[in-house]
């Protein structure tokens, strides 16, 4: 077993060796390096064929028509293109958007930008377990609501929203429904031929493909229109200009192909490892599970250890690559906005750790992690005056701290 142990697969994944090997064939002179938009010679045709194959592989994993897949630079761009693109195109119908407080920043910050441009956004607060109350969603829908954006799997706590029912609700009212599926694609079954989802964002690097490539699903029947955010050569049926990065697209396609083949067995394995991890630490005093194991992705476990400062815990766990909050926001020392939205106090939110498991995680690594967490929590609490006061029965909420 090699240290440190990587348990931050929700931040990014290593590229699968099979994917890397495939990508190498699309870079150099003796490979397929052409521009897929070059229509006048074989180099371009071969590149275009490689892109077509990858587009099919991605469509097959999610039950889409390959013509509904638009390549982007990643899920952040896909979220921007979907939300801004739909809002701008349909703004004559209305200017009201609904999303949730626990969405990824790529969705929340895009909505904030649209608010500056005159749109109105309703931010739904989830229930204590992170799931959106569908009655609240229904109550928020208005005649001028044009777009709902609710993610599939939350990147911090792993809860799974009921995108099938939300899709039915939106379709019945003629509202466009966008889903950020970055954390769920290849981990949970997605069948867009059955789901009433109009726009869906995907990433390459959360599923053992390369960074810098993603896709947006744009439904054809009923046809969804979006306004391009990037202008140029009119690539990707006018929705996203820019020369297609063939090697990255091929890598994403191969990653999605592998995911389709291995998803069922891999998810059962990861669910077992996640449960093993939780069972190994759940009897520590004052430990709380954030999210919902039953309605949760099989690979994410978010846990709060009360009376332990999260950053000091991460330092103590230096042999484990884990995160507090998500990588996209961990540059700030603010407690996780996702956990705050669940109604958690700052102290508990600060003491939370996200463990996310993946394809190369082993049972041996999980057992090592359990042992290390138990020892570290014990050691840090021995040093903590708060823990001592708690053990003496002092109500810490009633204490007035002196300001020196």
Swiss-Prot record:
Record keywords, A-Z: 2Fe-2S, Cytoplasm, Iron, Iron-sulfur, Metal-binding, Pyridoxal phosphate, Transferase
Any single GO BP term: [2Fe-2S] cluster assembly
Record keyword Nucleus present: no
Pathway: Cofactor biosynthesis; iron-sulfur cluster biosynthesis
Primary location class: cytoplasm
Modified residues (N6-(pyridoxal phosphate)lysine): 206
EC number: 2.8.1.7
Binding site for pyridoxal 5'-phosphate: 75-76, 155, 183, 203-205, 243
HAMAP family, per database record: Cys_desulf_IscS
Assembly information from the UniProt record: Homodimer. Forms a heterotetramer with IscU, interacts with other sulfur acceptors.
NCBIfam families: IscS (TIGR02006), PRK02948.1 (NF002806), PRK14012.1 (NF010611)
Function of the molecule: Master enzyme that delivers sulfur to a number of partners involved in Fe-S cluster assembly, tRNA modification or cofactor biosynthesis. Catalyzes the removal of elemental sulfur and selenium atoms from cysteine and selenocysteine to produce alanine. Functions as a sulfur delivery protein for Fe-S cluster synthesis onto IscU, an Fe-S scaffold assembly protein, as well as other S acceptor proteins. Also functions as a selenium delivery protein in the pathway for the biosynthesis of selenophosphate.
Name the UniProt record assigns to this protein: Cysteine desulfurase IscS
């Amino acid at each position: 077993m090699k240290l440190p142990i990587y348990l931050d697969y929700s931040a990014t994944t290593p590229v699968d060796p099979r994917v890397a090997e495939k990508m190498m064939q699309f870079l150099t002179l003796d490979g397929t390096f052409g521009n897929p938009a070059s229509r006048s010679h074989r180099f371009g045709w071969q590149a275009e064929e490689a892109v077509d194959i990858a587009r099919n592989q991605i469509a097959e994993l999610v039950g889409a028509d390959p013509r509904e897949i638009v390549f982007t630079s990643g899920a952040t761009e896909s979220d921007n293109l979907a939300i801004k693109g739909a809002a701008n195109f349909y703004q004559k119908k209305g200017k009201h958007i609904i999303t949730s407080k626990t969405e990824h920043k790529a969705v929340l910050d895009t909505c904030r930008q649209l608010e500056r441009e005159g749109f109105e956004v309703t931010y739904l607060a989830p229930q204590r377990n992170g799931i959106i109350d569908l009655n609240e969603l229904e109550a928020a829908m208005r005649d001028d609501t044009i777009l709902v954006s609710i993610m599939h799997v939350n990147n911090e706590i792993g809860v799974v929203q009921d995108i099938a029912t939300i899709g039915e609700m939106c379709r019945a009212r003629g509202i466009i429904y966008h889903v950020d599926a970055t954390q769920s694609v290849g981990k949970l079954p997605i069948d867009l031929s059955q789901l009433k989802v109009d726009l869906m964002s995907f990433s390459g690097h959360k599923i053992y493909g390369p960074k810098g490539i993603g896709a947006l699903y744009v439904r054809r029947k009923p046809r969804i229109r979006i306004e391009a955010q990037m202008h140029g050569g009119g690539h990707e049926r006018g929705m996203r200009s820019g020369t297609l990065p063939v090697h990255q697209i091929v890598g994403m396609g191969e990653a999605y192909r592998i995911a389709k083949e291995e998803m069922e067995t891999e998810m059962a394995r990861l669910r077992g490892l996640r449960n093993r991890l939780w069972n190994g630490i759940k009897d520590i005093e004052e430990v709380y599970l954030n999210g919902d194991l039953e309605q949760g992705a099989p690979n994410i476990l978010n846990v709060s250890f009360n009376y332990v400062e999260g950053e000091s815990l991460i330092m103590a766990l230096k042999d484990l690559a884990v995160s507090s909050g998500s990588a996209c926001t961990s540059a700030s020392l603010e407690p996780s906005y996702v956990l705050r939205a669940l109604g958690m106090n700052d102290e508990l939110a600060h003491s939370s750790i996200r463990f996310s498991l993946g394809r190369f995680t082993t049972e041996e690594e999980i057992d090592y992690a359990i042992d290390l967490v138990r020892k570290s929590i014990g050691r840090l609490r021995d040093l903590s005056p708060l823990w001592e006061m708690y053990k003496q029965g002092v109500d810490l909420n009633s204490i007035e701290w002196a300001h020196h």
